[in-house]
Amino acid sequence: MSKGNALVKGNALVTGASAGIGAATVRALVADGWTVHMTARRAERLKDLAAETGAVAHVIDAADQIAMAALVSEVPFDLIVANAGAGAAMTALTDAGPSEIAQLVTLNVTSVLQLISAALPGMAARRRGHVITLGSVSGLYPTGSTLYGATKHAVRGMVRNLRIEALGQGVRFTDIQPGRVRTEFYDVAVKDAAKRDAIKETGIDELAPDDVAEAIRWAAAQPAHVNVTALEIAPTDQAYGGARFPE
């Protein structure tokens, strides 16, 4: 990946690539000169994206730790974008059943840890590599979903600690923390149709998947001696924290 401060764009892996931010990231990285591999469960969407971009498709569930570990052992990835994840229904934690809690933690936290654990030894041996995680503003601020927010707090902590754990090995870590993005997220996260429609009709000019993909591309394109540890990106009309008072 690096020679001095130069960046060599080799093999990149994008998980959860069949739609939204993942698909946009595949397009952005291919355009930027990376050899992109992508994973997702939806085979037809991957097939279409592969035909469009030339990226290499692997129909793998990101939660399938054995298959993901096999892939990273076969291909020496210089960049991994751990995008695959899910949103939790925006209900109280006590309304989430044990299976829903376990499923979300497995996909949003455990699968990311396992992927990094499988890839890091090879990156360290080559003394080059970059892992980019998809966090969320929900990992920074209380947004009203305890379960989802907890998983994104975990991802943020993961990246911060990996920066220390892998220090001196030539491996970079970045957590991208988007606000509202125009994707399928709310179709899953909000079960009540009326509430879902109300959220979508707030008038906020949401981020497009391409906006987040550009942030990912930019972080990955920095010189090898530059580590963008975290990047919060949100719509101009969305803000968290503090308080607003009448003028």
Segments (PLM) and residue ranges:
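Substrate-binding pocket helix/loop in short-chain dehydrogenase/reductase
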Residues: T91-L93, E100-Q103
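Active-site helix of classical SDR
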Residues: I116, T151-K152
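Residue(s) in the substrate-gating loop at a strand-loop-helix junction
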Residues: S136
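Active-site-adjacent segment of SDR/Rossmann-fold oxidoreductases
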Residues: N161-V171
